[in-house]
Amino acid sequence: MRSPFERRLEACQRRLERVDAALAALVPGPNLTYLTGFEESPSERHLLLFVPRVGDPVVVAPAMYDAQLRTLPIETLAVRLWDDDDDPLEEIEAVLAELLPAGDGDPGSSRDGDAPTILVDDRMWATFTQDLRACAPAATFDLASRVLEDLRIRKDDVELEALRRAGEIADRVSLEIRSRGTELVGRTEAELASEIERLLAEYGGGDPAFETIVASGPNGARPHHHSGDREIERGDPIVLDFGAFVDADLEDGTGRYPGDQTRTIVVGDAPGDEYDRYERVHEVVREAHRAAVEAVEPGATAGAVDRAARSVIEDAGYGDEFVHRTGHGVGLEVHEPPYIVADNDRKLEPGMVFSVEPGIYLEGEFGVRIEDLVVVTEDGAERLNESPRGWETGSGVQ
């Protein structure tokens, strides 16, 4: 029985055929992890996966990775190693000579007889791209997102299950923080951020998926505020944005998928006029969020979802204070396609996962953002977050 990674590699090869490319060249990062299950950080050492349109994939890697690469669940994967005292470009040049077509009629050759095209990882360092050009001077180059984006943008059942678990963990943390109510008064943003990350781990999450945001009072007007030493005060609105990675249940491979949730709460009682204003702005954002989720369905465009949220906020007079797109795709990366922005005509399809996170940011005063992850289903949207979206805090919140 083929592993999930073998099926993904075959799908990649079919797409290489579709775009008339000879091969894809990938470096450590989400694309390589998606196709092989191998997870490693980029470094100055040459580690490249070559996926030819026709034939078996080949990985060129430092010898130090031999054991990890040979246990990957891909029977057809050829492993070519180099030692630190070797010139890795000699091995890369030899592999490219084997994989690239020598002329018209060879497997993988361009249909129109032009030079073969190599699709390079969008995250490949410029120095590595220059090395590939030197090793294959007759080739033309384009970006691997031409084939990998279309593969990764629709999540399979295993990926969706990991994303659901990440959402459930975020929900549990959200409820726990809300339940503490005025106990949060006097704590710094950084202290609360650390507590959120501790709870994410306690409830089964892995590493934080991104820097946890605790933005209290006027700091909430900065969408990507760095949690600092400001002490939370009674009556403060607080923007909380957090999530943790969860491992997908892939046989003999890895793949981490993130949670990503934002809630805005008020701790204790604010003065009446201020609280009324907080509540009005929060309700506008909440209605924008509802409108965007209701706009999600197969065949709708990503731009239509953005416009659904944006029109609510503009009609309420806060259009200039909604300073970012409505959402972003989520998968092996916290930010990936599809991007939920007004001019994106990409049609939504079942299995796509993205955030819906409208916000209003009033500089020097406060901010409000509400974010859930949603999955496009056959007839609409499934929310991956179900924790309360209102202002309320305290032990009675459900």
Set out the residue ranges of the language-model regions.
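Active-site neighborhoods and metal-handling regions in enzymes and metal-associated proteins
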Residues: M1-Q398
